Amino acid sequence: MDLLDWNNNSEDQLLGIKLARDVKCINAFLQPGFPYGKRVWDNCAKILSERTDEELSPYFVELLEWLQDLNWPGTFIIINRLILFNGDSLLETYSKVVYTALRNEEENNEWLDHLSKLLENHHLSKGLNRNLHNIMLERYNSFWR
């Protein structure tokens, strides 16, 4: 994990990413905390983005939580990876997370806007029930366009 620190030179960071490809337990790359913190998040997102849908699927909730703040390192890498994901696999978890966030909409307003970006995943977008799709489409159009 030390090699992934953004304070390292690019060669060391690339070596860290390369070595991480052999790590089987990828939950270590889901926004690690102390002692590494945000300094490694961008490279962790790069590592996760290279993983298969099958490898990532147990961590949908954590990946969606990464979208809570667009300023967090690696957020756009995670967004772009989720847009490419098999939407059918993501549908149930995405719907649950969005409905949970809507229960406290005022507190989760920005996160819901960020989650709306995943409507660009056409399989996911098509699979949403009409009501949820319309709510998120309105957010998408007001935030991303």
Mark where each language-model region is.
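Structural detector for internal amphipathic alpha-helices that build alpha-solenoid repeat scaffolds
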Residues: 10-22, 41-54, 65-69, 73-85, ...
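Eukaryotic acidic, Ser/Thr-rich intrinsically disordered low-complexity regions
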Residues: 2-4, 11, 22, 112-145
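Short terminal alpha-helical segments
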Residues: 1-26, 34, 38
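Amphipathic alpha-helical scaffolding segments comprising HEAT/armadillo-like alpha-solenoid repeats
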Residues: 1-2, 22-33, 53-65, 87-99, ...
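Short coil turns that connect the paired helices of HEAT/ARM alpha-solenoid repeats
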Residues: 3-8, 33-39, 65-73, 100-106, ...
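Short, intrinsically disordered/low-complexity patches at protein termini
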Residues: 98-100, 114-115
